[in-house]
Amino acid sequence: MTDSKYFTTTKKGEIFELKAELNSDKKEKKKEAVKKVIASMTVGKDVSALFPDVVNCMQTDNLELKKLVYLYLMNYAKSQPDMAIMAVNTFVKDCEDPNPLIRALAVRTMGCIRVDKITEYLCEPLRKCLKDEDPYVRKTAAVCVAKLHDINAQLVEDQGFLDTLKDLISDSNPMVVANAVAALSEIAESHPSSNLLDLNPQSINKLLTALNECTEWGQIFILDCLANYMPKDDREAQSICERVTPRLSHANSAVVLSAVKVLMKFMEMLSKDLDYYATLLKKLAPPLVTLLSAEPELQYVALRNINLIVQKRPEILKHEMKVFFVKYNDPIYVKLEKLDIMIRLASQANIAQVLAELKEYATEVDVDFVRKAVRAIGRCAIKVEQSAERCVSTLLDLIQTKVNYVVQEAIVVIKDIFRKYPNKYESVIATLCENLDSLDEPEARAAMIWIVGEYAERIDNADELLESFLEGFHDESTQVQLQLLTAIVKLFLKKPTETQELVQQVLSLATQDSDNPDLRDRGYIYWRLLSTDPVAAKEVVLAEKPLISEETDLIEPTLLDELICYIGTLASVYHKPPNAFVEGGRGVVHKSLPPRTASSESTESPETAPAGAPAGDQPDVIPAQGDLLGDLLNLDLGPPVSGPPLAASSVQMGAVDLLGGGLDSLIGDSNFGAPSASVAAAPAPARLGAPISSGLSDLFDLTSGVGTLSGSYVAPKAVWLPAMKAKGLEISGTFTRQAGSISMDLQLTNKALQVMTDFAIQFNRNSFGLAPAAPLQVHVPLSPNQTVEISLPLNTVGSVLKMEPLNNLQVAVKNNIDVFYFSTLYPLHVLFVEDGKMDRQMFLATWKDIANENEAQFQIRDCPLNTEAASNKLQSSNIFTVAKRNVEGQDMLYQSLKLTNGIWVLAELRIQPGNPSFTLSLKCRAPEVSQHVYQAYETILKN
């Protein structure tokens, strides 16, 4: 008979019967009784009253009965800690049993009983099991150490178990090695500062030897451990890669992904000129392709990981486009992921093939998939310039189908194509206008309105078209209302005599009849601009917009590097670092790739890609910065925790492109009516000077100005939150960067009459993802008139949202009295990283590659420094002089710097000896940064 019979009873008074049976002299009856107890426990009945009777059954030679009793013990020991001590003697005895299965069972159960009271009794049996002659017992004991460490870390360290665990890495049995590595990794993860896994070439060699012989899960533990090792040079990295490569052909997909992670990390250290590098690239493709023949759930995980790999090294899969073509029976989540990878791999060589596929997808029945396919065609046009004409033609064919949702998506993406290729495809506007009546989705209506407003001079009846939208103004979404307001103002500036009545009508609707503050604000801005200075209004509203970037929503480079280190884990599926979704007090280690060798810089790497925004795949409307209370009130400001504050899991980290073209100009972007766009018509950064190109090609002959480091400039503390606004709490502070770490140096003063305790701090989302790296620790209560100084470490892995101004930081501080809010501006130079020195050839190539429109020129006045002093001072704040020369008595410093999010800024600083005015020319793919970089230059040089 099967064990199902134990689950069918519903008798009353069963506990008493079970008690009698458990104390029976007959072994069979006793075993039956224990089975009934376990069955009752499994279905949720409380059988804890039988604890002493069940524990008495431990004294048996029957392995099955012993397992059942141990199962009961694990479940009820926490609720009956005093009774659990009764079992200790049996554990000690079982750990010396001649049967290794019983010894292992005892030590496994010991680790699972999470009761502090009995842990010290278990140390001696565990010590014996760690040195047991049987490898099965040793491997079980290794895992037990990690479990015991979780309950009482200090006890494990005092008893020397960690050293024993390290010794097991040299064990002769590969499974013991794997479990020891797994246990040490688990402990090291929860205690990042412990430096437990201090690997060296000898121990790495032992791990690689064990790798070939242990089970698949043991291999995963070892591979994950190898991924945390930093080889001393490229030769060692290559040696490890050679020994890990055979794992790529393993049947278990988890082993394959762990091997890919190791290879992706160590490839950073290999020179691209090596034959082995090319061989490795070829070997990586087949296993990744094989993963796509698994069941859909595994395919999805594989595709999310491949998405990261393709962003980091597109060359691995550039010839494998066909495997990402969608199959008719793929689930929607697999289809959408494949579509995204197809766009990432699209190039001039395969674009015809890709477009043919996308056009076919656009005729499918799944509406969501069709929409994505139409958007993908637009993204291809923006990414591969040579295909733009064919893409536009394909989109027009789709518009002719008159399928409503296809037409609407096509109009949205054509608007982006107009932005990317101005004055090239405007001939299709007439076709678009024919479909005005069928548009019912806000995004499509807003896109069409933008097109009409932007090209009003080419559309004869533009005023009639916009007037038709105006009739139902109050019924439109905010996105459409904002876009309509801007479009009519553009039309008025282009045809003032014919549209005066129309512009007055829309301004009246926006400012007097609307309850929406964003709409009212924008209406008032336009009204004042038009009434005070129509010429300025024209310069602002009709300013030339920067081109949108050809990069399609790449993950920000530093985040991408971190996610590559988490291939095969949940982080690689969410595309978020673990600290964004893992709760609890464990320390979070931020992993990063090893530094690249000089010749391994990938030309296709996002590191060197323009810092552009998503062009085709539209981000959601960015929420308003609003008043400071808005977002900050929703932040979790609970008591301090031992780990860094966690970002809300709903925030898509890394998905917001910070400074790229998609956000450059809110006029005409997909984010129509984003509330933060109340100054949507802000002019594009003007070109403030002619491009300084003369003599740049001589850079190879120049000598580099290298200065000595004297520490990054630190501004004096300023009052950020006066006491009168914070119920007696005054907060002053400044920002510093020392040895690569950013800190917020705070001074808290209690000017109230009561003691202040329970401090906590949280930042709102901001342009560079600044976030506290640790809780705000005020170790003693802050008494009246007492001041305390705190250095709060910061990191840049928080949630990203473009702020206005760019360096605006909104902060919430909580104590036992209330929650207080303030905002401050952080100096951009604290974000300048230490590896911001570009080599000369790269500098020259990048300078030429960045469009002249992105160049800005500034004057720095009243600066008494000579050239060498200026260079040294700037270098101490991570602005590096790449080259220096003298032209007609004028010193020219060519400099580079890099921000924490991977954006490079190139500079030319002209210094005329004896003249206190310097001329600074800046070039950057994200022009919004230039003004703040200039301010950093001025601050550093003048202080």
Curated annotation (Swiss-Prot):
GO MF annotations, alphabetized: clathrin binding; protein kinase binding
GO BP: any one term: platelet dense granule organization
Tissue spec: Widely expressed.
Modification 3'-nitrotyrosine, positions: Y574
A Gene Ontology term for the protein's cellular component: lysosomal membrane
Keyword Lyase found: no
Gene3D superfamilies associated with the record: 2.60.40.1150, Leucine-rich Repeat Variant, TATA-Binding Protein
SUPFAM superfamilies: ARM repeat, Clathrin adaptor appendage domain, Subdomain of clathrin and coatomer appendage domain
Assembly behavior: Adaptor protein complex 1 (AP-1) is a heterotetramer composed of two large adaptins (gamma-type subunit AP1G1 and beta-type subunit AP1B1), a medium adaptin (mu-type subunit AP1M1 or AP1M2) and a small adaptin (sigma-type subunit AP1S1 or AP1S2 or AP1S3).
Task of the protein: Subunit of clathrin-associated adaptor protein complex 1 that plays a role in protein sorting in the late-Golgi/trans-Golgi network (TGN) and/or endosomes. The AP complexes mediate both the recruitment of clathrin to membranes and the recognition of sorting signals within the cytosolic tails of transmembrane cargo molecules.
Compartments where found: Cytoplasmic vesicle, Clathrin-coated vesicle membrane; Golgi apparatus
Signal peptide: none
Keywords: Acetylation, Cytoplasmic vesicle, Golgi apparatus, Membrane, Nitration, Protein transport, Transport
Disulfides per UniProt: none
Protein name, UniProt field: AP-1 complex subunit beta-1
Low complexity compositional bias, start-end: 594-616
Principal subcellular localization: membrane
Family: Belongs to the adaptor complexes large subunit family.
Record region (Disordered): 584-621
